[in-house]
């Protein structure tokens, strides 16, 4: 039985006690990863309680029904003593009719909350991990891996390779991304999303995903999203069409050297029929050279409303799948450390015999049950050396031997820094560098090995294109003819002599 003013006082006290608990929790040293995760879950729970108390307090201060205003007026009026004794009488009557009712102060409630926090068994209900996840240190993607193996027309990988490449979905052609593929991506995203919430409860994941959504919409409108860009495949080029400058060609035979796909793309761009043999396509395209109007007989039929509707549905389906892939890229980036640790853990388990794995599991369970305060201490690492498979810093001589003290910066990868020459050389074949080259419109071939600057890559690509253009077969200069006397001349000279009647 509380008045509005008493409720406000109680909520203010509750907020102050919650703030004190959060400060104490934040200042407490966390000896290991398990304690850190539990501490962040406790902080999140306290923040939610603080938010709820603040919302209730704000509603009371808004006083939409004017009850608070009326209560203050009654206490501050001329009959304040009569009001006081009337309320005291109500309180006595309430406890007389409810003798078992006990008012528990907030201090007792918070003491009980602190006792629960200090008991690990009671706090284990806040977050749970499987045995494979190792208390939040490793990923358990076995179920997702089984779904991946059941996908048709995808490369079959072992589990370790899958761990390091499950986000390389841009390498899968869009034609193979069917309903089963979408179920696989949704399952993988659900697991990664839930895992991030368990190991990083204080992370503003909704804000991160909102940024991903905005960035995806921008890339989709520009046609640059990985795996779905306009320049991604020849089929996409053929479907959208690309204009071709015919001024550089003097005959349809020269156009035929471009191939079926390029001719089809040019015909689609002009709205012409794109079927037929190579010669028919080349002749049809060459017949439009220098003409301002096109022959209606050469025009392609407009797609029906049914076909347009099917294309629209297919476009929306591709967009939904691409949106799921954008989330997958973000999840993989947030879990990069756990991903690398999972690979090392799986490799270490595969290198052991069955008996050694059982002994290791027993030792791990015993170490978790021990109360050694130094067991999970953060290792002494003043030089910020990388951690080995045992979770301890590697020796400094090994750090220098592998050249990990040398940093390599790659502008094509978005100014990403690689530690050591081995990681630097390996990254040219990895997804980050390949995606950067794809955004530049340059194939990631051996010609561009060790090229890290965007300007250098573009310059080299222009040079390679000019060399390829110079090596291109030119019929007028390289096609040879022989006259009746056995003289061998090129095509252009032969036609000039023929027109002049000198043959």
Curated annotation (Swiss-Prot):
Belongs to the SF3A3 family. This is Splicing factor 3A subunit 3. It is found in: Nucleus. InterPro entries: Matrin/U1-C_Znf_C2H2, RNA_Proc_DNA_Dmg_Regulator, SDE2/SF3A3_SAP, SF3A3_dom, SF3a60/Prp9_C, SF3a60_bindingd. Residues 296-317, 341-384 are annotated as: Disordered. Probable subunit of a splicing factor complex required for 'A' complex assembly formed by the stable binding of U2 snRNP to the branchpoint sequence (BPS) in pre-mRNA. Involved in male fertility. One of its GO terms (molecular function) is zinc ion binding. Residues 358-377 have a biased composition (Acidic residues). PANTHER family: SPLICING FACTOR 3A SUBUNIT 3, SPLICING FACTOR SF3A-RELATED. A zinc finger (Matrin-type) spans 408-439. The keyword Zinc applies. The keyword Nucleus applies. The gene is noi. The modification Phosphoserine is found at residues 360, 365, 367. GO terms for biological process: fertilization; mitotic cell cycle; mRNA splicing, via spliceosome. Keywords: Metal-binding, mRNA processing, mRNA splicing, Nucleus, Phosphoprotein, Spliceosome, Zinc, Zinc-finger. Probable component of a the U2 small nuclear ribonucleoproteins complex (U2 snRNP). Ubiquitous. In ovaries and testes, it is expressed in all germ and somatic cells. Highly expressed in spermatogonias and spermatocytes. Highly expressed in the germ cells of larval testes, while it is weakly expressed in fat body cells, in polyploid nuclei of salivary glands, and in larval brain.
